[in-house]
Amino acid sequence: NYMITILQARTRGMTLMRMPLTVWGIFTATVLAMLAFPALLVSAIMMTLDKVLQTSFFMPTILKAGEVLEYGGGSPILFQHLFWFFGHPEVYIVALPAFGIVSDLISVHARKNIFGYRMMVWAIVGIGGLSFFVWAHHMYVSGMNPWFGFFFATTTLIIAVPTAMKVYNWILTLWRGNIRINTVMLWCLGFIVTFVNGGITGIFLGNVSVDVPLSDTYFVIAHFHMVMGIAPLMVIMGAVYHWFPLVAGKMLHEGLGKWHFWITFLGAYSIYFPMHYLGFIGCLLYTSDA
């Protein structure tokens, strides 16, 4: 519905290169969902067959009454590939609409056209396309061939280029704009700061030699929650404060909105930012109680 509406039901004169960036983000995320979710569906079906019919897609061996049965060919690594082929585009299914929304909010509340509109569009499309070539950076410690690790580390760093372009364009849109530091703008600025912090930690985890000692530590928890938790939440709240008056015909309280932002921002950083240090000193996510 999203794809056909955007492609076929635009108003007269609304060309693709005139659409709001929010719509571009939703459109690209919809394409990613159409291509990525089948991998998750297939892996779920294969896992169900392994459990119910004792097939061997993911299970290399099976025990029955303490006896190893003839059961071969399965690989748990195959499940990881299928899951993460869905899992990493899913990050951008969440992030790309947020990128579009924050671009439009910054433009409105800086009272200035978004800097480099076409560049922003192609950055959204480029991020979406590259998201299908980076999934195995979640699997550096799975025993993959080092050349594959090198390939996925390279693509992971490449996808940072269009992402950085978007951040630069947001900053250049703010530059010399007639900025109103209201609640919506605070949420947008909080998103930029949080997303940049999360992106920097992502560079650590995208590098094979650094990721191996940091894998399964609290550093990963901090990175994930900054990028996939706090940053999108800030965009959602900014969008609510921006569009609620249009929907309800009432303005939300500006003073309470700023309190809401600062409690959320400082609270999130007080919880997740120290986890980077915990990861660096080797605090693991999982510890055996045996």
Tell me the role of every PLM-derived stretch.
Residues 5-11, 173-176:
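Short amphipathic alpha-helical coupling elements at transmembrane boundaries
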Residues 286-290:
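Conserved small/polar residues in nucleotide/adenosyl-binding loops
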Residues 7-25:
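Membrane-interface helix-loop-helix junctions at boundaries between adjacent transmembrane segments
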